Amino acid sequence: MTKLFRRRLLKFLTYAMIVFCAYIIQTTPGLFDFFGIQPILVLPACICIAVYEGEFAGGLFGFFFGLFCDSTSETIFGFNSLLFLVFCVFAGLATIYLFRRSTMNIMLLCLGAIFLRSVLEYFFGFILFGYENLVPFFYTRLGPQVVLTSLFSFPFCLLFRWLHGKFEPETTKV
């Protein structure tokens, strides 16, 4: 085992432990519960991994931790894993080809991803089945969840940027 391989293995195990801890915090009842609304912490963490490590690693993290979220979600199984995969691959490719890797861009990517996820959950979970008078639900539950999750994307961005800098080999730093 080479030193570079051990460093990468330790880096991705550290990433996995952080995202798993975010999942545990996300699914613990009453923890980070603001007026009955809990943020989705796994998605911003996976998007930050995709931004700093590329679309392949981000897509894998998004898919596998999306499966974790599917196991505790009220949506159909596979909804979160498919969306997290698409969002993370898009975030990784967007930072390679379109955007700079700045904190503001990462936060905007997280905001867009969580907003799109909430709109799709609202559509496929409620509108498609013909429930009526659900506009207040969107504004009182899903809207604040989008804002709360976006606020938590800032610490994740700083944490993963710091970790990426610590684990990056000296020969590849620019």
Regions found by a protein language model. Give the residues of each.
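Terminal, non-globular segments
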Residues: M1-V174
